[in-house]
């Protein structure tokens, strides 16, 4: 289905140069004496490469309709990640290449949405926040209060985030999946 570039929104899947791309950000720009254009940040769903592309406002964009299926993460075996459809209990496995940075947030029983196009998984949508356990960090200070001072903490999935000094090993914290940043204690 073709739409004008001005109707492109983050989260859409589009076909660009014959390949599927996820739209990450869209900015409408109108420089002084030039025609308006759309600056979009895209991720190639096959290769995972991120790039920016400039579309003219009237350019037709081919929007791809994908099937979004709620699934639950079960486990991983090397580079294979296994998910279960929560409606019919069928299992699907995806390669690490397809998941990209999302693997740093996957824990057992995490509810996610998997996008399928022509029966092939093309990506996943994580929840806004996830709860992860701190496995390694410097000891906390008893008198530490919320301030701009932070320290690195390694989480159960291997993700490293900056946390306040009062966070200790073994604590569960809430992490923003879009920014990869500490939000609060769980």
From Swiss-Prot:
Pathway listed: Protein biosynthesis; polypeptide chain elongation
SUPFAM superfamilies from the UniProt entry: Nucleic acid-binding proteins, Translation proteins SH3-like domain
Subcellular location per the Swiss-Prot or TrEMBL entry: Cytoplasm
SMART domains: EFP, Elong-fact-P_C
GO biological process annotation, one example: peptide biosynthetic process
Principal location class: cytoplasm
Keyword terms, alphabetized: Cytoplasm, Elongation factor, Protein biosynthesis
Keyword rRNA-binding listed: no
Entries under PANTHER family matching the protein: ELONGATION FACTOR P, TRANSLATION ELONGATION FACTOR KOW-LIKE DOMAIN-CONTAINING PROTEIN
Protein purpose: Involved in peptide bond synthesis. Stimulates efficient translation and peptide-bond synthesis on native or reconstituted 70S ribosomes in vitro. Probably functions indirectly by altering the affinity of the ribosome for aminoacyl-tRNA, thus increasing their reactivity as acceptors for peptidyl transferase.
NCBIfam families: efp, PRK00529.1
Protein name as annotated: Elongation factor P
């Amino acid at each position: 289905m073709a739409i004008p570039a001005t109707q492109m929104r983050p989260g859409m899947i589009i076909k660009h140069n014959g390949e599927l791309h996820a739209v990450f950000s869209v900015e409408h720009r109108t420089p002084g004496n030039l025609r308006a254009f759309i600056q979009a940040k895209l991720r190639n769903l096959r290769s995972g490469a991120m790039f920016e592309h400039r579309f003219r406002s009237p350019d037709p964009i081919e929007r791809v309709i994908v099937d979004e299926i709620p699934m639950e993460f079960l486990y991983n075996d090397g580079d294979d990640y296994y998910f279960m459809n929560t409606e019919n209990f069928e299992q699907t496995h995806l390669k690490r290449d397809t998941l990209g940075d999302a693997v740093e947030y996957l824990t057992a029983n995490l509810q996610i949405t998997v996008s399928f196009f022509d029966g092939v998984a093309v990506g996943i949508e994580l929840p806004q926040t996830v709860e992860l356990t701190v496995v390694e960090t410097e000891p906390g200070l008893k008198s530490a209060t919320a301030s701009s001072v932070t320290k690195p903490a390694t989480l159960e999935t291997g993700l490293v985030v900056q946390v306040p000094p009062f966070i200790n090993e073994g604590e569960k914290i809430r992490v923003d999946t879009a920014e990869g940043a500490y939000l609060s204690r769980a």
